[in-house]
Swiss-Prot record:
Basic and acidic residues compositional bias, start-end: 103-119
Encoding gene, per UniProt annotation: RPS26A
Protein's UniProt name: Small ribosomal subunit protein eS26A
Family stated for the protein in its record: Belongs to the eukaryotic ribosomal protein eS26 family.
GO molecular function: mRNA binding; structural constituent of ribosome
Lineage: Eukaryota, Fungi, Dikarya, Ascomycota, Saccharomycotina
Cited function: Component of the ribosome, a large ribonucleoprotein complex responsible for the synthesis of proteins in the cell. The small ribosomal subunit (SSU) binds messenger RNAs (mRNAs) and translates the encoded message by selecting cognate aminoacyl-transfer RNA (tRNA) molecules. The large subunit (LSU) contains the ribosomal catalytic site termed the peptidyl transferase center (PTC), which catalyzes the formation of peptide bonds, thereby polymerizing the amino acids delivered by tRNAs into a polypeptide chain.
């Protein structure tokens, strides 16, 4: 039977067993190397309260702390939430990360990036 992908959907290579992690969406237990991992970096303070805090702060130019969460998704939840997409056989061989869209000040995609995407 043909193999669908060279990595078997994992990043194990030589390790017999990998500890499981839980999917943040459905709590399914999946091997840590198979899970789709994303970092969620957010400000602890919401955008509406940032100005109030900076005015009330004793320290000038105080950098507000951020939360750093590593999110683990199972394959089915990652596809359902469009974190990863299903790709064709030829595109599956491409290991490079996809191009990230560049936004200008009005949160619009720049024309140069839109032209690259159209090709």
């Amino acid at each position: 039977m043909p193999k669908k992908r060279a990595s078997n959907g994992r990043n194990k290579k030589g390790r017999g067993h990998v500890k499981p992690v839980r999917c943040v969406n459905c709590s399914k237990s999946i091997p840590k190397d198979k899970a789709i991992k994303r970092m969620a970096i957010r400000n602890i303070v919401e955008a509406a309260a940032v100005r109030d805090l900076s005015e009330a702060s004793v320290y000038p130019e105080y950098a507000l702390p951020k939360t750093y969460n590593k999110l683990h998704y199972c394959v089915s939840c990652a596809i359902h939430a469009r974190i990863v997409r299903v790709r064709s056989r030829e595109d599956r061989k491409n290991r490079a990360p996809p191009q990230r869209p560049r936004f200008n000040r009005e949160n619009k995609v720049s024309p140069a990036d839109a032209a690259k995407k159209a090709l």
